[in-house]
């Protein structure tokens, strides 16, 4: 059974991101567009809570149900919500195209109901040596976010 979800991002960065997964055994395809980004890399993460009552700050930390350190999408030791970076050219829109085999739209670890956050700076993928590298990727301010909701198939 295919599951689809959508996230409308608001803030200084704005856009729409779609999620699609064919089954619980297949990767999630993430696609969409974001505007309002400066040229360069921007951290792109799923955060724990679907709470945006205090803007992006109330979405909590990266979604990390297994208590791992921050890492790159290809790392075994990473938060489930660590989706790496999206690259902006400085022109609108910035395209989002990610395929990830760790996140899911099924079961207890589903990202549906959680928040996507776009950050001001590049995610150093846990390798930067900064005090925040192993927790946030030192990706800077939260400049856009939205709750992931289930979408019509």
Swiss-Prot record:
Coiled coil: none
Disulfide bonds: 56-145
Location(s), subcellular: Cytoplasm
UniProt-listed Pfam families: Sod_Cu (PF00080)
Protein origin, superkingdom: Eukaryota
EC number assigned by the record: 1.15.1.1
One Gene Ontology cellular component: cytoplasm
CDD domains: Cu-Zn_Superoxide_Dismutase
Cofactor(s) named in the record: Cu cation; Zn(2+)
Entries under InterPro entries matching the protein: SOD-like_Cu/Zn_dom_sf (IPR036423), SOD_Cu/Zn_/chaperone (IPR024134), SOD_Cu/Zn_BS (IPR018152), SOD_Cu_Zn_dom (IPR001424)
Keywords tagged on the record: Antioxidant, Copper, Cytoplasm, Disulfide bond, Metal-binding, Oxidoreductase, Zinc
Residues binding Cu cation, per UniProt: 45, 47, 62, 119
Known partners and oligomeric status: Homodimer.
GO molecular function, one term: copper ion binding
Protein's name according to its UniProt entry: Superoxide dismutase [Cu-Zn]
PROSITE patterns found in the cross-reference section: SOD_CU_ZN_1, SOD_CU_ZN_2
Family statement: Belongs to the Cu-Zn superoxide dismutase family.
Keyword Oxidoreductase appears in the UniProt entry: yes
Gene that produces this protein: Sod1
Catalytic activity: 2 superoxide + 2 H(+) = H2O2 + O2
């Amino acid at each position: 059974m295919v599951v689809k979800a959508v996230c409308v991002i608001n803030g200084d960065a704005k856009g729409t991101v779609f999620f699609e997964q064919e089954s619980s055994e297949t990767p999630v395809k993430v696609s969409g567009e974001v505007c309002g980004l400066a040229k360069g890399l921007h951290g792109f993460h799923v955060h724990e809570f679907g709470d945006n009552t205090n803007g992006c700050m109330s979405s909590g930390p990266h979604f990390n149900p297994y208590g791992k350190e921050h890492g790159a999408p290809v790392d075994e030791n990473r938060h489930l919500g660590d989706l790496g970076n999206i690259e902006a050219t400085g022109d609108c829109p910035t395209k989002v195209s990610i395929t990830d085999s760790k996140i899911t739209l099924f079961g207890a670890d589903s990202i549906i109901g959680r928040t996507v956050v776009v950050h001001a700076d590049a995610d150093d993928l846990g390798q930067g040596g900064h005090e925040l590298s192993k927790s946030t990727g030192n990706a800077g301010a939260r400049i856009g976010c939205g709750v992931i909701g289930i979408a019509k198939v």
